[in-house]
Amino acid sequence: MCLCGTFGLGLALWGSCTSSGGKTETVMSDSVDAEQGNVVVEAIMSRRSIRKYKDQPVEREKLETIVNCGINAPSGMNRQPWQVRVVDNADYINGITEVFKKANPKAAEEPGFKNMFRNAPAVIFIASPKDGSGQLDCGLLGENMVLAAQSLGLGTCCLGGPIAFMTGNQEAASYLERLQLPEDYALLYAIGVGYPDESPAAKPRDAEKVKFVE
C-alpha cells in the first residue's frame, strides 16, 4: 500500500530506555504492537537508511508511485515549490560517478563501491527555489517519498554529499544541465532508491527532546 499524502511521527511507540553518560535515550522497538496493522505507523517505525543495495533495477511503475506520493505532500498555500528529477539511467549514474572518482580517487578503493549514490540503482533529485523558500515543503515531499518506497519494499537514503559535488565541480556541470532545472532553482538533496541488501537495526531516539506542554 502506498502512503500518499502521509507525514507523521510514531512518538508513542518507543520501547525500552537506556542510559548513557547521564542522558536517557529511548530506543525504538522493532515491533509496533501498540498499533498493529496500521500500515502508516509500521512504515515509519520500520524505515531505515539503506546504504547497501541489490544489483536489481527499480521498476519504473514503483518510481512513478513514489514520486506521485511525493507531490501529494502539503506545501504552503499549495505552491508546490519543488522540481523533481528521477534518474534510473545507468549511463547517467555511472558517468557522473566517473567524474566523482576522478576528483576523489580513493572513493573507488572503498569495498563494494559502485556509484556515488551509495550504489543505489535509481536516484531522485529534489530542487528548491534559489531564494531559499520552499525548503521545508521539499522536506515534506521527501518524507512522503521515502515512506512510499518503504511500503513498496524498497530502501532509501537521503543524500547531500553528491549534491555538493555536482554543484561544485565544473566537470559535473554537464550532468547538472541534463536535469533541466529552471534557472531560479537549485538542487537541494537527492534520495537513493533500490532494493535493500542490508537490514540495519533501529538506532536510539532521544525521547527527552519531546515534551507535552500543559
Residue ranges and their predicted role:
Residues M1-E214:
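Acidic, surface-exposed loops and disordered segments
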